[in-house]
């Protein structure tokens, strides 16, 4: 029970760090509603993953408590009535069904001497969700995925440069190489 309470308290702190996700950092202007709804879904899927990691539950076991306690807070903080539920369930079910494969891709992207066990839980769950989107949701531009998960890493006080570098490297080398090398893409 203490693990669940600790996880829920940590999630409340994270929800308070969301200002960079719902608006443009440079202008302060709110992003479009559809973008914020999808951002809320991404954030919720990462928070659920973190909760499951901390409590030792599966994603599906942790989901009811998480949905009852945090989805409304996330939506309110991102100034949306509700998150993009379809995207949330697609990410959660994808990570749940492909966890071993996603972890293998993360391990392949790590520097020599690094293992999954050495990663912070927050970085691990962010990477799983980001890689899932890069690999399985090709209708979403790779740059958007990279930007969103970098913002989520920042909200979680995770190593943003590490998360971005690993996702970018996998996108360029394996998952979205054609898109990432297309004219107009920054190198």
Report each predicted region and the residues it spans.
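N-terminal interaction/assembly modules
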Residues: 1-187
């Amino acid at each position: 029970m203490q693990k669940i309470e600790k996880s829920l308290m940590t999630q409340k702190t994270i929800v308070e760090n969301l200002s960079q996700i719902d608006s443009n950092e440079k202008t302060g202007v709110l992003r479009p509603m559809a973008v914020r709804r999808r951002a809320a879904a991404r954030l919720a899927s990462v928070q659920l993953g973190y909760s499951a990691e901390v409590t030792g539950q599966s994603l599906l076991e942790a989901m009811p408590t998480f949905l009852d306690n945090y989805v409304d807070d996330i939506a309110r903080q991102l100034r949306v009535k509700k998150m993009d539920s379809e995207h949330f369930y697609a990410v959660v079910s994808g990570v749940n069904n492909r966890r071993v494969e996603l972890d293998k891709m993360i391990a392949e992207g790590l520097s020599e001497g690094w293992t999954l066990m050495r990663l912070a839980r927050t970085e691990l769950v962010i990477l799983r969700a980001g890689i899932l989107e890069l690999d399985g949701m090709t209708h979403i531009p790779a740059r958007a995925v990279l930007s969103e998960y970098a913002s989520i890493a920042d909200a979680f006080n995770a190593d943003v440069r590490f998360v971005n570098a690993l996702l970018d490297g996998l996108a360029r080398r394996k998952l979205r190489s054609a898109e990432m090398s297309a004219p107009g893409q920054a190198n």
